[in-house]
Amino acid sequence: MKRDTSRVRVCDILQVDTSDVVTIGLRGCSNITDQCVMDIINRCPKLRSINLSYCGKVTDAGVSALGAGCGQLQSIDLSFCSKLTDAGIAALGAGCGQLQSIDLHGCNMVTDAGISALGAGCGQLHSVNLSECNKVANAGISALGAGCGQLQSIDLHGCNMVADAGVSALGVGCGQLQSIDLSFCYNLTDAGITALGAGCGQLQSIYLHGCSRVTDVGVSALGAGCGQLQSIDLCGCSRVTDAGISALGAGCGQLQDIYLYGCNMVTDAGVSALGRICLR
């Protein structure tokens, strides 16, 4: 008979003194339930970080208990907790004001309501991963822009309901932003990218893979405003030409990585402009 390793490990934890435990990692422990999460909360009053990614049995009940009982929580990974909804996320927003990092990758039942609760209650957030949260739209992202001025990294890969309004709010409110992934945000245009160029001068990496509506206008805004840029992915941005690439070459002297697969309008002239960066 196959041994239930996830259950054994948690039982071992709960049989010893865990009053000083600050970090617990349970990634992929598929038999972890809400009751187990509640037991951990009761026995680990100093908990600062918990990883429950791929714990498919964990629901809003367990996450809400974390919100109510772990006011010092700073980091939580709930990626691919497929039963999680806005109710659990709202509880974190209400109770975890010190939260700095949250990963909700693949939590596709979470909507703007949950993300708005984080924006309202978690002003210390530095890192947010909403990759493939395809029900999150501009309202949720705008709430993060308004409430999370310390945000440094946000992943919106595959959030195809996010467009210029949400991204522009990040540009206005998140001046410390260093990394943003907007890959396959199909509705994004130059307006959102221009806002990032104007407001996010510390930006180091941006991923625009598949953002086919972005043109030289948006890319040139990044070149003008993001002098610390080190990595940019423009794969599939078929409207970008030499003009945009040349603007990056002129303004982004720290650029190390650029991806142009599918940029069929870029010619030798644009590549030559990038080549001049490498000679500095």
Predicted stretch roles:
Residues Q15, V37-R43, A61-G69, A87-C96, ...:
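A structural signal for leucine-rich repeat
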Residues M1-R48:
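LRR N-terminal entry segment and analogous cap-like coil->beta motifs
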Residues V22-R27, I50-L52, I76-L78, I102-L104, ...:
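Conserved hydrophobic beta-strand positions in leucine-rich repeat
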Residues S53, I180, L234, A250, ...:
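Intrinsically disordered low-complexity regions specifically enriched for long asparagine
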Residues M1, I13, C107, L118, ...:
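Generic low-polarity alpha-helical segments
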Residues D4-C11, S30-M38, G56-S64, S82-A87, ...:
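Short, solvent-exposed loop/turn at the beta-strand->alpha-helix junction
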Residues S19, S30, N42-P45, G56, ...:
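Inter-repeat linker/turn residues at the boundaries of leucine-rich repeats
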